[in-house]
Amino acid sequence: MNSLTATAPIRAAIPKSYMHIATRNYSGVIAMSGLRCSGSLVANRHQTAGKRFISTTPKSQIKEFFPPPTAPHVKEVETAWVHPVYTEEQMKQVAIAHRDAKNWADWVALGTVRMLRWGMDLVTGYRHPPPGREHEARFKMTEQKWLTRFIFLESVAGVPGMVGGMLRHLRSLRRMKRDNGWIETLLEEAYNERMHLLTFLKLAEPGWFMRLMVLGAQGVFFNGFFLSYLMSPRICHRFVGYLEEEAVITYTRAIKEIEAGSLPAWEKTEAPEIAVQYWKMPEGQRSMKDLLLYVRADEAKHREVNHTLGNLNQAIDPNPYAAKYKDPTKAHPNKGIADLKPTGWEREEVI
């Protein structure tokens, strides 16, 4: 297996001394002032719920970040997409993987991901440690820094699926032809990424600076991905596949740090109720580590789905994740992670 690093071509063009100063100062501002974390994460559990941490939010506005709707006659709002049930064994088998670039289109996608990875590392204060240097102080991540990274990552991760689904929907209307199942899978992916974001927002509320960064990143990314998908959907799906490889790396490292005791505030933190309901988390498996295992499994599934879609003929092939196959005894693409293929299914395997 081969994991990607945060190294990008742009980094080589910046003097080391300047890069160190910029990264330390700029990422520090975001990591420390971008969020207001819940008391159970960064402070003693005996502190009151009204205790305010570093934030730009006025005191009078402190309340649940997104409370349920005030509709007396509505009990709850159901989702159209029910999440598949993962077993603990399946989630623990998820591993870091990398699909080798095989042609110029793959290299374009991979190079773009590496450049974006560098930018995301900068704004979230994350530094990926080389092997054997994980315990050095400059690579240490706190609970607050991890939440900053998770929220920023998930706030833009829901864009590709929505853009792809929207463009394929319009294409189907314009050509007056069926889409053969692509739209549903892409929209469901966007919905899943949004649920990741809503879950993490139950643990920390972004301040004005974080909101500004998300607004700018989402605006640029949406328009850039929109134009790119019009030009080459296949490169875009490969790009998302590589991006999800990075997401698996991020969550894997966070899980390992919890296991190593490096994030003590998360050892007793329970998953929010929104996560328990969405993933159907069983009793006794609702810790912060369990939550990250579920999120990582989702990212691994998106990695497989987009690498698979990137292998297909975008114009005529049906979506293998919405297809019923003639031979049910053989492994085929599905919504679960029982037959997970980290680098995607090849076209000859599914079409």
Swiss-Prot record:
Binding-site residues, Fe cation: 154, 193, 196, 245, 299, 302
Domain of life: Eukaryota
Transmembrane intervals: 147-167, 212-232
Cellular localization per UniProt: Mitochondrion inner membrane
Membrane-topology annotation of the record: Multi-pass membrane protein
Binding annotation for Fe cation 1: 154, 193, 196, 299
Main location: mitochondrion
Keywords, in A-Z order: Electron transport, Iron, Membrane, Metal-binding, Mitochondrion, Mitochondrion inner membrane, Oxidoreductase, Respiratory chain, Transit peptide, Transmembrane, Transmembrane helix, Transport
Name of the protein described by the UniProt record: Alternative oxidase, mitochondrial
Organism of derivation: Aspergillus niger
